[in-house]
Amino acid sequence: MIRLIITGSLAIAACSQTLETPPAAVAPGSANILRVVFKPKPDRPIVAVQWELAVPGELQIAAADVVTGTAAESAAKSLNCSARNDPKTGKLCVCILAGGVKVLPEGAIAIVKFAAPADAKPGTVTVRLRKIQGVSTELKSVPIADVEAAITIR
């Protein structure tokens, strides 16, 4: 019975939509980008996505620093983000990617520009995408698992 439950969980995870955020690095006093990459499943097309981006205080980011990626642009989507300070995470950006009825293809749906202050200490910090929700072509909510990215300050 336990084996069936574990296998079922793996099957559900294998069939779900995912976002990926490859690791990135930045030197103190400079900027870099983080790509948010969408990995779709053809059996459940997505037309819109919303998420929260939790950025630690060691990095600097503004809502205007989050722009559409090439996959989102090819589907004629627009991206709107709102940022606020968060005592737990540092900065919190809430983003909605939507517009029209075209399905999101695989690829970068958002590009996040971030910077490390000149006095940033070397180390690794974690950026989190959480509370991710997709919207299907039938306008049904499609939960997407949270994801983290490691940012190395050199």
Please describe what each predicted stretch is.
Residues 15-154:
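Acidic, low-complexity intrinsically disordered segments
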